[in-house]
């Protein structure tokens, strides 16, 4: 990062950290489980208020995504390999899970779902053209797919232009979020899922990448996690009896504060808890796409089944890569 933006202190990154950081993988696991617990609250399976902030796992995913992909383009900027890896990594599980959810909704829950809606999922457009069709977890994956097209272009920019772009994304998202919370709930709920609300997560992910590339550390892990806990408490104390104040507090104030903290944690992640937590991070994509369906079918137990199905479907696709990474942990 240019020195006139932040004061920094140098870090020494190990070879393993530059190539693969298990602490980052662990963060992905935490994010997926956070969203899984959040859906226990939205489905009213286990409506505990402590699960309400769980949706914040989504922007953590988005920040990590652009942060990691920009790093990988530093190592190998070959576009064929970049897109081939994204397709191999995302498409098989995405199409399998989208089709499975469609069939369960149609034949088990007897919901009114159409082939057209399934087609929109297949071409990554359902989140915009048919929001809330038959599974609303796929909207984030569709946003990611479109973002994958822009990340190589962002990577080619100078650090200064990356930073200016990041600031633009953050400000536009903040203005958008502040505006939509003033609308009636039905309109807000729809616009909340649209891409503009989430662009700030990518903005902070870009800034995290610039800072990391320049070996800059801002806060200690303990300080960042302490601040994260305070934000969590702030979320739980948001006034639920006033819809406007609640959405303003949670979707604007807390959301934008937590994005900064996520950036700090990405730059200096907490230590690895165990191989299990890292492994959950490695199959976090599978956990994310399967957990909601399993919760709808089995309730609380659905979280465990979601992890099991993620293991059965994602692990075989990346078996060698995952096992190699786990061996690195010793």
From Swiss-Prot:
Keyword entries, A-Z: Acyltransferase, Host membrane, Membrane, Transferase, Transmembrane, Transmembrane helix
Membrane topology label: Multi-pass membrane protein
Transmembrane segments annotated in the record for this chain: 29-49, 50-70, 90-110, 118-138, 163-183, 190-210, 225-245, 252-272, 273-293, 297-317
InterPro entries: Acyl_transf_3_dom, Acyltransferase_3
Record EC number: 2.3.-.-
Gene Ontology molecular functions: acyltransferase activity, transferring groups other than amino-acyl groups
GO cellular component terms attached to this protein's record: host cell membrane; membrane
One BP term from GO: polysaccharide biosynthetic process
Pfam families recorded: Acyl_transf_3
Annotated localization: Host membrane
Top-rank lineage group of the source organism: Viruses
Chief subcellular location: host cell
Descriptive protein name: Putative acetyltransferase ORF330
């Amino acid at each position: 990062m240019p020195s006139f933006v932040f004061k920094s202190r140098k870090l020494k990154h190990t070879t393993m950290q530059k190539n693969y950081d298990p602490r980052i993988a662990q963060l992905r696991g935490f994010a997926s489980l956070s969203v899984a617990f959040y859906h226990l609250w939205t489905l009213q399976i286990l409506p505990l208020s402590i699960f309400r902030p769980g949706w914040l796992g989504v922007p953590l995913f988005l920040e990590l995504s652009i942060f990691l992909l920009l790093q990988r383009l530093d190592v190998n900027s070959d576009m064929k390999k970049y897109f081939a890896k994204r397709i191999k990594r995302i498409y098989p599980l995405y199409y399998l899970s989208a089709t499975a959810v469609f069939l369960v909704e149609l034949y088990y829950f007897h919901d009114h779902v159409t082939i057209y809606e399934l087609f929109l999922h297949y071409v990554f457009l359902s989140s915009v053209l048919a929001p809330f069709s038959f599974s609303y977890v796929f909207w984030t994956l569709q946003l990611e797919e479109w973002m994958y097209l822009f990340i190589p272009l962002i990577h080619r920019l100078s650090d200064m232009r990356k930073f200016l772009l990041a600031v633009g994304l953050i400000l536009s998202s903040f203005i958008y979020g502040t505006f939509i919370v003033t609308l009636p709930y039905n309109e807000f709920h729809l616009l909340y899922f649209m891409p503009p609300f989430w662009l700030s997560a990518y903005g902070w992910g870009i800034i995290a990448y610039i800072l990391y590339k320049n070996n800059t550390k801002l806060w200690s892990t303990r300080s960042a996690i302490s601040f994260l806990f305070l934000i969590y408490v702030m979320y739980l104390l948001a006034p639920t009896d006033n819809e406007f104040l609640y959405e303003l507090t949670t979707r604007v104030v807390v959301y934008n504060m937590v994005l900064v903290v996520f950036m700090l944690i990405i730059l200096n992640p907490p230590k690895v808890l165990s191989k299990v937590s890292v492994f959950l991070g490695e199959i976090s994509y599978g956990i994310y796409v399967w957990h909601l369906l399993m919760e709808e079918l089995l309730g609380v137990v659905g979280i465990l089944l979601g992890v099991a199905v993620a293991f059965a479907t994602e692990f075989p696709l990346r078996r060698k890569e995952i096992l190699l990474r786990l061996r690195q942990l010793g």
